[in-house]
Amino acid sequence: MAKNSVEFDRYIERKAFDNTKEGVKGLIDAKITEIPRIFHVPQDTLPDKKRSVSDLEIPTIDFASVNVDTPSREAIVEKVKYAVENWGFFQVINHGVPLNVLEEIKDGVRRFHEEEDPEVKKSYYSLDFTKNKFAYSSNFDLYSSSPSLTWRDSISCYMAPDPPTPEELPETCRDAMIEYSKHVLSLGDLLFELLSEALGLKSEILKSMDCLKSLLMICHYYPPCPQPDLTLGISKHSDNSFLTVLLQDNIGGLQILHQDSWVDVSPLPGALVVNVGDFLQLITNDKFISVEHRVLANTRGPRISVASFFSSSIRENSTVYGPMKELVSEENPPKYRDTTLREYSEGYFKKGLDGTSHLSNFRI
C-alpha cells in the first residue's frame, strides 16, 4: 500500500508541476531555495555525479581545409573516423556557421524562455512535440517511467522536411531558428559525406538513405539550481537520431561516458559538438558508436544549448532500416534487427530518459 501511495504522490506532484505550464524557470522565479522532490535523482546515481577529473578530451577537428584538396579532405575523414569509432563525439571548428548566427540562436532561445508575459510561453506549452510545429515544455518524459525530472525547460521544432511558416514560430526566436537551421542542414550535408567516406563508401550513401531528411531542433534552457547535487540537467542517455549537432554556451556541464568514466565536453568558443546517434550505430553495425551522455545541474546559469537531431522524426515514416549490406558479411553478421524510425522512437520516448539503453532492445 505504501508503495502505491508513493507512486501516486509522485504522479500528483508531476501533474501539479505540469499544470503550472511555467517549467523549471517558474520555480526559480518563485525564489525557491530547495528543489521539489520530483527532481531528486536516485541516490545510487549520486556517487559518480561529479565533474571529470580526467585529462581526457574529446577530439577537436578543424574543417577549414575540407574542400581545399583531396589530401586535406582525406586527413579530415581519418580524424572523423577515429572520433566516431572511438569516442562517438567530436567538436568541430571552422565549420562554416557564422559566429553571429551562433550567438543569435542562443539569444533567441534566452528571449523566449525569459519572455515577460507568461501567457505567451503558456500558449505554446505541449508535451507532444510530434503534433505541434513548435512546442515549449519542461521534461518531455514527465509521465514516463523515468525516476526523476531534470532541471531544464525546452522548446522544440521540426525544421525539415516540412518547416514551419514564420508565423508558427514565436517572434522572439523566429528569425534565429530559421537562419540557424539553414546552416545546420548545410553542415549536416557535409558531415554525412565525411561519415560515408569514413566507412570507405561513396560520399552520397548516407544521404541516399535519408539520414539528412528530417531535422528536429530542441533548445534547452537550464536555470541556475539551488541544490545542483540533488538533480541533473539531463540524465544519462544516448540520442535516438542518426547524428546530433549541438551548440552549447560557455557554462559547461555536458559529460560523455568514455571507458566507464565521465569526461567533460568543455565549451570551445565558436565550436559545435557532433555526436553519433543510436540509428547511426545500428545501420553501421557498431562501426560508429552512440555514446551515453548527460548534463550536470549548476548554481550558475541559465545554461543554453541547441541540439539539432537529424532524422529523429516519429511522424509517418515507413522506411525500414537495418545494418547496411555493405558493412555485413559472414565474418561480420548483422548485430541488430530491422526497424523503422517510428518504431524505435516511439519506444524511446515511452521509456523516457531513464538511464537505460533503448538500442540494446534491438540487438540480435
Swiss-Prot record:
Binding-site residues for 2-oxoglutarate, renumbered to this chain: 303
Alphabetically ordered keywords of this record: Iron, Metal-binding, Oxidoreductase
UniProt keyword annotation of Metal-binding present: yes
Limits of the Fe2OG dioxygenase domain: 213-312
Molecular function terms, GO-annotated: dioxygenase activity; metal ion binding
Binding-site list for Fe cation: 237, 239, 293
Keyword Metal-binding applies: yes
One GO BP: biosynthetic process
Protein name in UniProt: 1-aminocyclopropane-1-carboxylate oxidase homolog 11
Organism, as annotated: Arabidopsis thaliana (Mouse-ear cress)
